Amino acid sequence: MFLCLFSAPVLNVLSRANAQRQAFTWRSYIPLLLLLTVLTAALTWLYLSLSDEFTETLVSRGEVLTEPRIFLVQCSEDYENHKRFPGCTPTKCGRAVTDSVVTKEEAQILKRLAERGLALGGSDGGASILDLHSGALSMGKKFVNIYRYFSNQISEVFTEEDFKLYRDVRGRIQKVIAETFGLDSSQMYLTKPTFFSRINSTGAKTTHDEYWHPHIDKVTYGSFDYTSLLYLTDYGVDFGGGRFVFMDSNSNRTVEPRAGRVSFFSSGSENLHRVEKVVWGTRYAITVSFTCDPDHGIADPTLP
């Protein structure tokens, strides 16, 4: 009986107005819905990247690789933003692991070298570095030059044999990288930073202690074209956590450190990675980095 108060034209106008209001209301939510979709996708990616439930072990500590185990990936465009060097700039990208370049005994000698150097300083947080090239040594919340700060003690801390082994190992790592990626090793140059690292479970005191963040070496350092890690201690024996994690789009892929193990990879976005937080014990390693640009090359260290 109430509908008879309105004529048909009036009802049509009211219906159209109501429909327009509803359409406007839904359209106003579209940007919010799109934002929520993007945020959900980003959070899902982050969860998958950081969750151990979606992790594949590339190489376990218990395996012994007498030949490099190679995993090829498509090269990123990062290298296009830098000058190209034929025979060196990555055209074949990937990651590889081998246990046949450095012996366990040599790794133990290098670990003792690092222990002696780091005993003179050390970070207040969980991550300390020693760079034999620049002399940089973590001390408290800052860095000092070990060669200047401890000039009277250097001969008691390092020996020429230590440095000779360090140079020899660097050469062997450079050779296996060149062979694996089909490079001219004479066109590869050691670059900075190249350093020893010591990581334990102590909480971070400065940003320098926050080693666990995902990053891309080519983006972070610019000069890097190939990155290598020489592990000096054993995962699950000397420390817990601290695995090296390649963060691929569909899964995490980890390398479990083993004393004497060398892991190496092209340094671009194709190898986004992080290191798990060390939860107990102490993890020692050497980062040995290479560039194709001679202007960014550094010399082997020499004992002062």
Tell me the role of every PLM-derived stretch.
Residues 2-262, 269-304:
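Fe(II)/2-oxoglutarate oxygenase catalytic core
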